[in-house]
Regions:
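Conserved HGGG/HGGXW glycine-rich cap/lid loop of the alpha/beta-hydrolase fold
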Residues: 5-54, 68
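Short beta-strand immediately N-terminal to the catalytic nucleophile in serine-hydrolase-like folds
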Residues: 78-80, 109
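Flexible "cap/lid" loop of the alpha/beta hydrolase fold
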Residues: 100-143
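Gly/Ala-rich beta-loop-alpha elbow adjacent to hydrolase catalytic centers
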Residues: 80, 84, 88
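Conserved acidic catalytic loop of the alpha/beta-hydrolase fold
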Residues: 59-76
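Catalytic histidine-centered segment of alpha/beta-hydrolase-like enzymes
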Residues: 238-254
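Conserved alpha/beta-hydrolase catalytic His-Asp/Glu region
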Residues: 144-185
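Conserved serine/cysteine hydrolase catalytic core
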Residues: 172-228, 234-237
């Protein structure tokens, strides 16, 4: 992809089991001089397939996405949803340390970092602790033998939506999920085992954090804890939606992204 000399890009990282399509309705009003990048995650295309049994890490994802940033880019705005939020945070750290491209801002819808919640289970609210304990103790969810299987996919999709969602999905959508089931499992393993403590993700750039009113208790806690270590962050609760609000309520989310661009421009 070509970008104009001295150009900024806005790179959006999609969530587990979705794709770049989730960003389409959000990109109608990018700031002047900013080019959108919506790459496909590692393993979601035949060229980058992750075969069953192969471990895929956050570092692998970051390297894959970093390679998508065109030569000549001067600044990067990073966005992400769920697992994509963890990757966006990690990419922001790597780019900042490298010093090659300035990270301008972060816009994240419910970034998922289960690992630091698991590490501090004793300090969690009861409803959060209950969910986290289930994820850590479930005999199937974080075990390679079952990861990405039909039963695993059903459990994953129903957890982030509601019971029966997997069964109600069109067969074409279920078939596509099966094709990337192992990589989906690897992404869940990353958020549960590789995510660092919240204090690791401290920045001094504009940050917007969004969560749905009806999201899960852990997702609520993750957003709050990430905001606590980033006092400059704006944390907004979107009424009437849950974890998948980017897909289910794109106009509502797009309005919040427009607010983010306004805050960035005002600095």
């Amino acid at each position: 992809m070509q970008v104009d000399a001295m150009s900024d890009v806005a790179l959006f990282v999609h969530s587990t089991g979705t794709g770049p399509f989730m960003w389409t309705r959000l990109l109608a009003a990018l700031p002047s001089g900013v080019t959108a990048l919506t790459p496909t995650n590692l393993g979601y295309s035949p060229a980058t397939a992750v075969p069953r049994g192969q471990v895929s890490t956050v570092a692998d994802e970051v390297a894959h996405l970093r390679a998508q940033i065109p030569e000549g880019t001067t600044g990067v705005h990073l966005g992400g949803h769920s697992y994509g939020g963890l990757v966006a945070l990690s990419l922001a750290i790597e780019l900042s340390l490298a010093g090659e491209v300035a990270v301008r801002s972060l816009w994240l819808y419910e970034p998922v970092l289960f690992a630091p919640l698991m590490a501090h289970a004793e300090s969690l609210p009861p409803d959060v602790a209950q969910d986290v304990a289930w994820l850590d103790s479930d005999p199937h969810f974080l075990h390679d033998e079952h990861g990405g299987s039909e039963a695993w996919l059903q459990g994953f999709v129903d957890y982030w939506n509601q019971a029966g969602t997997w069964a109600a999905m069109p067969e074409k959508s279920r078939a596509m999920a099966r094709m990337v089931g192992w990589k989906m499992y690897q992404e869940v393993r990353c958020v549960a085992r590789e995510a660092r403590d919240f204090a690791h993700y401290q920045f001094n750039i504009p940050m917007t954090l969004l969560r749905g009113e009806h999201t899960t208790a852990p997702a609520r806690e993750m957003a709050q804890r990430l905001a606590a270590v980033n006092p400059q962050a704006v944390l907004t609760v979107l009424p009437g939606v849950g974890h998948m609000g980017v897909v289910s309520a794109p106009d509502l989310v797009a309005a919040e992204l427009a607010q983010h661009w306004g805050r960035v421009a005002a600095l």
